[in-house]
From Swiss-Prot:
Location relative to the cell: Nucleus
Ranges for region Serine protease: 73-263
Domain (PDZ): residue spans on this chain: 290-368, 758-843
Function: Nuclear serine protease which mediates apoptosis.
Family: Belongs to the peptidase S1C family.
Protein name: Pro-apoptotic serine protease NMA111
Lineage: Eukaryota, Fungi, Dikarya, Ascomycota, Saccharomycotina
A GO-annotated cellular component: nucleus
Keywords attached to this entry: Apoptosis, Hydrolase, Nucleus, Protease, Repeat, Serine protease
Length: 990
């Protein structure tokens, strides 16, 4: 099971020939759901300023035309389900229009239909809705066709727009009728200014049209108008809206010539043939053609033959190993094909599309010399991917002609369209990678790649060789971890142009992980003259984790940090909870940069930001040493030695001193997730420590005094903020001792937030002078009181209130935060503890009996319609005054029905089809009764307790309902795909 996240909206620079190189950025005009602030439904009868039409007759003509056209225009709400080729997985809106009412054919853009899986529906002018499925997307040009069932539209007569490409003329007044900027209907006016511009270039690693003229006009269309008809005053479609400038009112329309041919093929049930010689032409003006070697005779002939043309086609990019490779060179001017003089892209397309498998004769001029070459025309569809593979959480397909053309490379290779999961090779670049080999086996094509992946066992580490399209000179080599348990699917998807669905087959079941063998490792002492310090390298290791599921709203990432061995005989290691936030992940320990072995999670502290893991001591043969742990808390002014790991995993050391020990409050994230609370952090005067994300503080005799840990904080500017602080080892000692005794520890806590306040503040709040004197007499480190900063919502209400000043617990004066850590016990202890609190509230001393609670880690999640649902985790209880439901959304996929229909992270689902869903089990029972591709009503509650309702359409083919549940006794996670089979699969064992 894997989850992807992506975003489609982009602004790109145009650099195509014939335009100003400093031209403003361009964008395609599809509209992303996340960018909709408010959608207003605009009535077809739009008030119009008559003066803008020149006269009343023109106004009435346009008014009548628009009234007819809007009956053909539809708003398309769609999801491109999987990352494919140049397109991310995305939910968006666009426009289309009916071109055949009887067959139910809608014309829109290719970048709307997309090259990969598509799910969508169309909304007609009268707000009737029907599903649409792709029946054709052009391999190169920016158009595609969707099909709908005309019988589903009951309350209006469907009208088709007639395509008239010949009516597009310079100076013609036009209207763009569509879903502009997410509006239900917008009508934009303009005039055609050019018919012969080259296709706009939207930049690299994205879809670009080429080998066609584009029409230019000024209509100021924006996001959502993609696929809109460009109509004249007679109501004919003369072009198709495709893109435009983000900084000017310039729009780009696709001519309808090749679209009309494709439509006729569909109407007559004939294949839409598309030929290619794998060459990109650009239209260049005659003066530039002359500079490239066009002779005067040929120029005169062309000007006479095509008096309305301003230039000829010139070879721009010739793909290596293609039919025209070597025969045609960049800068060659095209004269004729098969004896026909050529002046436009339309002529070239017409010849190539009818000549697949045949040889054509091409005359070009190069440096004033005429050359005749012969090329065999290939099938453009054959070099356009129509299948992809999902394995190890990533997606792969053959390199497309679209991508190969942009970079001038052969159309071959395995393209990673989503570098995630095991193939998360660069967190900043998810697309554009080519797999050269894996497990030391070359992968020249997708079939070979599939066969190689079949042979690799689960949990194996293999070598990956790869490069990026933007830098073909640099070959990267790395080792990757094959995950076939969390990301268990190995599926081959293939496009079905009859149904519009991408059918899939399961390629292979995971091969069981190989049995691990023990290895020896040699430690290098720390280069220091103090033997007790030098050998501490034998007690340190690197801990790395691999996560695949955004449990508890925590990031899906691979984290590496250092750990400290606390018991070498039993294999216990203490590590930051930043690396081990939950147990729905894989943990590995590396000793001496030599031996890596798996580890299991045995303890997660609910508030102190540390975890304890365990490794098999029989798998590593090395001199691992259990260090001495201090029993004395650190104090301000203590001298100590910092030992830490830099970002490149190098050990560094420095003498330092403790500058402060104070209570720290880590800011909460806007989406609640685990953070350390009620901390007293140790600050040190050491520049080296700021360069290390993990380490220890030690005495000169090697006694461990504190852990240097990384703490996950809030998310800002799309980045997680990480705090670096020291945690006194005595705060962990009680738990460590229980583990050494062979007992399983657990911690019950006072579920409230605390912070330090000064004596002055305490006096103002009403703390009596006698208690202030007690504090002054007994406090050794800092004169402070502890106050309640917040109280969590719990099943049994906490009697503390925000603002309470804590005087004593169990009759002992509270001077430090550590006195409120809660109670450490063993797993055998069923009952939580009750503590006697004495507090000052509103100037009065009161006594309270406060019951501690055990924090439950998440042990069940469900994936429904692309959303991750689970019981509210502890951070949610900490952040809210009440919990509306036990079904909490912690994440939603960027191409999912959850996003499309309005489920957001931090929403609670309270009802499904008016059935209350108080917990996840009830929710799953209700969902199992809902058929595929049907709407269900959901009532939800926002994080701020605002109720709302949505209707959501299920899609179990691409978004099945899956449950992951942990057996608390065995520690095994079980995956169950509810919509497909009742077969249960164990995917991880602790």
């Amino acid at each position: 099971m894997s989850v992807t996240n992506s975003n489609r909206k982009r602004s790109l620079s145009e650099v195509s020939e014939g335009s100003d190189p400093e031209a403003p950025a361009k964008t395609r005009n599809s509209y992303t759901t996340d960018e909709i602030v408010m959608v207003e439904e605009v009535d077809s009868e739009i008030p119009v300023n008559i003066s803008s039409y020149g006269d009343a007759e023109t106004y009435l003509k346009w008014q009548n035309t628009i009234a007819k056209v809007v009956k053909s225009v539809v708003s398309i709400h769609f999801s491109q389900v999987a990352p494919f080729d140049s397109d991310n997985a995305v939910v968006s809106q666009a426009t289309g229009f009916v071109v055949d009412a009887s067959l139910g054919i809608i014309l829109t853009n290719r970048h709307v239909v997309g090259p990969g899986p598509f799910v969508g529906y169309a909304v007609f002018d009268n707000h009737e809705e029907c599903d649409v499925t792709p029946i054709y997307r052009d391999p190169v040009h920016d158009f595609g066709f969707l099909k709908f069932d005309p019988t589903k539209i009951k309350y209006m007569n469907i009208q088709a727009l007639e395509l008239k490409p010949s009516l597009a003329k310079v100076g013609s007044e036009i209207r763009v009728v569509g879903n502009d900027a997410g509006e239900k209907l917008s009508i934009l006016s303009g005039f055609i200014s050019r018919l012969d511009r080259n296709a706009p270039d939207y930049g690299e690693l994205t879809y670009n049209d080429f080998n066609t003229e584009y029409i230019q006009a000024a209509a100021a269309a924006s996001g959502g108008s993609s696929g809109s008809p460009v109509v004249n005053s007679d109501g004919y479609a003369v072009a198709l809206q495709a893109g435009g400038s983000t900084e000017a009112s310039t729009d780009f329309f696709l001519p309808l010539d090749r679209i009309l041919r494709a439509l006729k093929c569909l109407q007559s049930n004939k294949p839409i043939t598309r030929g290619t010689i794998q060459l990109q032409w650009l239209l260049k003006p005659f003066d530039e053609c002359r500079r490239l070697g066009l002779t005067a005779d040929r120029e005169s002939q062309a000007r006479a033959q095509f008096p309305d043309k301003i230039g000829l086609l010139v070879a721009e990019t010739i793909l290596r190993e293609g039919p025209s490779d070597i025969k045609i060179k960049e800068g060659d001017t095209l004269i004729s094909i098969n004896g026909e003089l050529i002046s436009s892209f339309i002529q070239v397309d017409d010849i190539l599309d009818e000549s697949i498998g045949k040889e054509i004769e091409i005359i070009i001029q190069r440096g004033g010399i005429e050359h005749t070459v012969k090329c065999e025309v290939g099938d453009l569809h054959s070099i356009t991917p129509d299948r992809y593979v999902e394995v190890c959480g990533a997606t792969f397909h053959e390199l497309s002609y679209q991508m190969a053309r942009f970079y001038g490379m052969p159309v071959r290779g395995v393209f990673i369209s989503s570098a995630s999961g095991s193939f998360n090779i660069d967190a900043n670049e998810r697309v554009g990678w080519i797999v050269d080999s894996i497990d030391n086996k070359e992968t020249p094509n997708l079939d070979t790649f599939i066969e190689v992946m079949k042979t690799i066992p689960d949990r194996q580490r293999v070598t990956l060789r790869y490069h990026h399209l933007t830098d073909q000179h640099t070959i990267h080599v790395t080792s990757i971890y094959i995950d076939r348990h969390w990301c268990s699917e190995f599926r081959l998807y293939k496009r079905n142009d009859v149904t519009g669905i991408w059918d899939y087959e399961n390629v292979a079941e995971p091969i069981k992980a190989e049995e691990l063998k023990p290895h020896a490792a040699k430690f290098i002492d720390i280069p220091i003259d103090i033997p007790e310090i030098a050998t501490l390298s034998h007690s340190l290791c690197m801990v790395s984790t691999v996560s695949a599921i955004p449990l508890d709203s925590l990031p899906v990432e691979n984290v590496k940090t250092s750990g400290l061995v606390i018991d070498a005989e039993q294999g216990y290691i203490i590590v930051s909870r930043r690396a081990v936030p939950h147990d729905c992940l894989d943990v590995f320990v590396t000793f001496a940069d030599s031996v890596m072995i798996p580890a299991s999670i045995v303890f997660l502290h609910p508030t102190k930001n540390y975890a304890i893991i365990k490794y098999d001591i029989n798998l590593v043969n090395a001199n691992i040493i259990t260090p001495k742990l201090s029993n004395t808390p650190m104090k301000r002014g203590d001298r100590t030695r910092f030992i830490g790991f830099t970002h490149n995993n190098r050990l560094v050391t420095s003498e330092t001193s403790v500058t402060d020990i104070s209570s720290i409050s880590i800011p909460s994230n806007i989406i609640p997730r685990y953070r350390a609370t009620n901390l007293e952090a140790i600050s040190i005067d050491c520049n080296v420590s700021t360069k290390c994300n993990s380490g220890i503080l030690t005495d000169n005799d090697g006694t461990i005094r504190a852990l240097w840990l990384s703490f996950l904080g809030e998310r800002q500017d799309n980045k997680d903020k990480i705090y670096l602080m020291s945690l006194d080892i005595t705060d962990c000692k009680e738990v460590i001792e229980l583990l050494k005794e062979g007992k399983k520890p657990k911690v019950s806590i006072i579920d409230a937030g605390f912070g330090a306040i000064s004596i002055l503040t305490a006096r103002i709040r009403g703390v009596p002078e006698e208690w202030i004197k007690k504090m002054e007499l007994q406090s050794e480190n800092r004169l402070q009181f502890i106050s309640v900063s917040r109280v969590s919502f719990t099943e049994e209400p906490v009697k503390l209130q925000t603002g309470d000043v804590i005087l004593a617990v169990n009759d002992k004066l509270v001077t430090e935060m550590s006195q409120l850590d809660g109670v450490v016990s063993t797993a055998d202890d069923e009952e939580s503890q009750t503590l006697r609190f004495k507090v000052v509230r509103e100037g009065k001393i009161i006594d309270l009996n406060i019951k501690t609670i055990y924090v439950k880690e998440t042990s069940q999640i469900a994936v429904f319609s692309g959303s991750i649902l689970q019981p509210p985790h502890h951070a949610v209880w900490q952040s809210m005054m009440n919990i509306p439901s036990g079904v909490y959304c912690t994440f939603r996929g960027e191409s999912s029905p959850a996003l499309q229909f309005g489920i957001s992270a931090t929403n609670f689902i309270t009802h499904v089809n008016e059935t209350e869903t108080p917990d996840l089990d009830t929710f799953l029972k209700v969902i199992k009764q809902i058929p595929d591709n049907t709407y269900c009503k959901m009532r939800l509650m926002t994080f701020d307790n605002v109720p709302f309702a949505i209707s959501l359409k299920t899609n179990y083919h691409y978004f099945p309902t899956t449950e992951l549940k942990k057996n608390i006794e065995s520690g095994k996670w079980i995956e169950n795909e509810l919509n497909k089979t009742e077969e249960k699969k164990i995917i991880k064992s602790d």
